[in-house]
């Protein structure tokens, strides 16, 4: 077989790969730099009074932001340790695989949907309140405030910590378990001598990761905060622009949020990151010996409690959604308009995220300079330094000097959501692209296959499934986003999360429950597509 050099250039052409990667980095730099420039100009203007804006209110909000993140992180990890230990010990526990899959759902659900699930269980009219009435001890739990924030954050982050801890358990050598069985070690001795050293090494990075997720939690605090006493920096930024329209206050809050985020990332870099294997299905434990009856009973109770804590809010979303008048809801034009808008914006953001991520991955593989390759490799992750609400606030302040910010809302929602999905898309695409390049580069060079022909005939079959995974994941993230649309949303641009927030704000709880079910089904369907693509890709690789 012979091939003539293609005249058309593309992402697969060696000459254009670094250029395409540079353009992708320029996109991220413009998005983040534009927001920082706007904030700097606003702060440097005559109307910014540092003493007036860095006041007791700001420091009170900052203290609460740190306090709720510390409490959420410690509680999430504290509850995760016995659950992970029990799941690892009970290798043949019925439904163990389903429980691990269930523990992957909280991060896949949009935060607004999960919050409604939490309120359906722990709210004043929730399941716990109904059970207490039936038992003759009526109670009205208050879900709004610090209690609700902690419950929701544990729901999101405890399953993540469990999966990360299971990955740490997998690193324990077989010889340690064999020796423990031969010596007849009890549960406490095994934990102290074998398990705890491995857990202790994983704790700093794991707590730091959960802390970062809680500090940048916007939707959960916005809906469950319950008032000024339970306000974080990101929610305060939103309130200062959306309700008070106080750009100077927003600048002070944004700089504080940015400084806190940078400090957390620095600490994470010093302490190390948790193993990425925790995000995948864990293998069967290689443990020798069986637990004693009392230990097994304790393990079963712990697993059941962990399962109920995660499963009940998800079931609450389904039950509440099905009790809503879905027929009437789906007959409303605004609902279909919101669905269409969400799908259009999500599709555009996912397409942009995959294209830019491919450009970075291809540029990294084609670059021979190690430093430049490292820039391409880490460039997408650097955008995580700036939370979406910070980028949105910066551009909102910048655009108001030139045009109506709400006119630019679709563009801002697409670009910010695409940028936030890029770190995950790069992680999914990089292994497949590097593998395909190592297999085919030499042969394609000898045959003169390059440009669009190489991309179509050689590279695309290898990266098709990872691209589908990245696209579905990015679209699901965009569908459930509320951070950017909360700033730029209006009657002219209504997405499903924005409409859901409006219905919650007007106390139309049944409508909100129905919309939450629709949004949750859409996002979970996309996540299932990505998961199936990953599974089929793994099977094809093993064959």
Swiss-Prot record:
Gene Ontology MF annotations: transmembrane transporter activity
GO biological process: thiamine transport
InterPro entries referenced in this protein's UniProt entry, alphabetically: MetI-like, MetI-like_sf, ThiP_ABC_transpt
Topological relation to the membrane, as annotated: Multi-pass membrane protein
Subcellular location: Cell inner membrane
SUPFAM superfamilies: MetI-like
Main location: membrane
Entry annotated with the keyword Transferase: no
Cell membrane keyword on record: yes
Annotated TM spans: 19-39, 64-84, 102-122, 142-162, 205-225, 250-270, 300-320, 343-363, 379-399, 406-426, 468-488, 510-530
Domain ABC transmembrane type-1: 62-266, 339-530
A GO term from the CC aspect: plasma membrane
Alphabetical UniProt keywords: Cell inner membrane, Cell membrane, Membrane, Repeat, Transmembrane, Transmembrane helix, Transport
PROSITE patterns xrefs: ABC_TM1
UniProt function note: Part of the ABC transporter complex ThiBPQ involved in thiamine import. Probably responsible for the translocation of the substrate across the membrane.
Family according to the record: Belongs to the binding-protein-dependent transport system permease family. CysTW subfamily.
Subunit structure: The complex is composed of two ATP-binding proteins (ThiQ), two transmembrane proteins (ThiP) and a solute-binding protein (ThiB).
PANTHER family reported in the protein's UniProt record: MOLYBDENUM TRANSPORT SYSTEM PERMEASE PROTEIN MODB, THIAMINE TRANSPORT SYSTEM PERMEASE PROTEIN THIP
The name this protein goes by in its record: Thiamine transport system permease protein ThiP
Organism: Brucella abortus (strain 2308)
């Amino acid at each position: 077989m012979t091939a003539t050099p293609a005249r058309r250039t593309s992402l697969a052409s060696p000459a254009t790969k670094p250029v395409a990667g540079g353009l992708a980095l320029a996109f991220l730099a413009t998005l983040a730099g534009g927001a920082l420039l706007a904030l700097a100009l606003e702060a440097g203007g005559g109307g910014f009074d540092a003493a007036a804006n860095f006041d007791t209110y700001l420091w009170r909000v900052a203290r609460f932001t740190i306090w709720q993140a510390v409490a959420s992180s410690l509680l999430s990890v504290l509850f995760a340790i016995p659950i992970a230990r029990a799941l690892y010990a009970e290798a043949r526990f019925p439904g163990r695989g389903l429980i691990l899959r269930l523990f992957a759902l909280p991060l896949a659900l949009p935060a607004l949907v999960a919050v409604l699930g939490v309120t359906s269980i722990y709210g004043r009219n929730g399941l716990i309140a109904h059970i207490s009435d039936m038992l003759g001890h009526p109670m009205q739990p208050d879900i709004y405030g610090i209690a609700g924030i902690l419950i929701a954050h544990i729901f999101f982050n405890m399953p993540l910590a469990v999966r990360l801890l299971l990955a740490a358990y997998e690193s324990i050598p077989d010889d340690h378990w064999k020796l423990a069985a031969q010596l007849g070690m009890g549960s406490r001795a095994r934990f102290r001598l074998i398990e705890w050293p491995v857990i202790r090494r994983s704790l700093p990075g794991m707590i730091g990761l959960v802390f970062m997720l809680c500090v940048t939690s916007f939707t959960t605090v916005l809906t469950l905060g319950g008032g000024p006493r339970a306000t974080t920096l990101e929610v305060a930024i939103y309130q200062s622009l959306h309700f008070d329209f106080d750009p100077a206050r927003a600048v002070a809050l944004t700089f504080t949020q940015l400084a806190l985020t940078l400090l957390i990332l620095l600490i994470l870099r010093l302490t190390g990151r948790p193993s990425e294997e925790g995000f995948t299905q864990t293998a069967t434990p290689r443990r020798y010996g069986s637990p004693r009856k009392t230990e097994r009973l304790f393990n079963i109770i712990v697993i059941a409690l962990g399962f109920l804590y995660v499963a009940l809010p998800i079931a609450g979303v389904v039950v509440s959604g099905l009790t809503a008048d879905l027929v009437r809801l789906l007959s409303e034009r605004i609902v279909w308009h919101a669905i269409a808008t969400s799908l259009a914006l999500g599709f555009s953001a996912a397409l942009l995220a995959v294209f830019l991520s491919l450009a970075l991955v291809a540029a990294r593989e084609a670059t021979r300079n190690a430093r430049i390759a490292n820039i391409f490799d880490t460039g997408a992750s650097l955008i995580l330094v700036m939370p979406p609400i910070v980028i949105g606030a910066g551009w909102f302040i910048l655009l108001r000097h030139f045009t109506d910010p709400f006119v630019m809302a679709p563009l801002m929602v697409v670009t910010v959501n695409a940028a936030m999905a890029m770190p995950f898309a790069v992680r999914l695409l990089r292994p497949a692209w590097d593998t395909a390049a190592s297999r085919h580069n030499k042969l394609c060079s000898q045959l003169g296959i390059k440009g669009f022909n190489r991309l179509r005939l050689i590279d695309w079959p290898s990266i098709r499934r990872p691209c589908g995974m990245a696209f579905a994941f990015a679209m699901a993230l965009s569908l459930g986003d509320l951070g950017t649309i909360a700033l730029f949303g209006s009657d002219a641009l209504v997405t499903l999360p924005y409409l859901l927030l409006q219905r919650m704000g007007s106390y139309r709880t049944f409508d909100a429950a129905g919309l939450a079910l629709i949004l949750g089904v859409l996002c979970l369907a996309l996540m299932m597509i990505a998961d199936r693509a990953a599974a089929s890709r793994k099977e094809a690789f093993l064959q």
